[in-house]
């Protein structure tokens, strides 16, 4: 049986737990009565992708080359579209989309669509994310197009509470 959804490609490895969680969410959200009804998924968990926050904000090694290679490998492997379970990597989504002939789904755009559909009167949305995600403004850029403001923690709370909980530091 061919899935009506096609084959999902997961651009993973940033961190591996986020990749595993995305896969589990796909499994748990798919109504099936037998194994053969699940959606085909190709996972490329690439631990060689440099730290996104370091590369974007602090002059570290750019993650873009490895993100491009990984996206292309998913396409060549038969993925019909790609998802990226890493917010900060969406900073490079235009380049990733331009590098392949299959859709690269933006979870930020999908989040906006969800909020607009479920909560059409909301004008402010809270964001807990890495410092890289917040400082790049990738959520602000997308949500401002819908006249929504993004609220995030103050710098001190961001580093001491949010980053600590994400990275376990």
Describe these PLM feature segments.
Residues 1-169:
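Non-catalytic structural scaffold of enzyme domains
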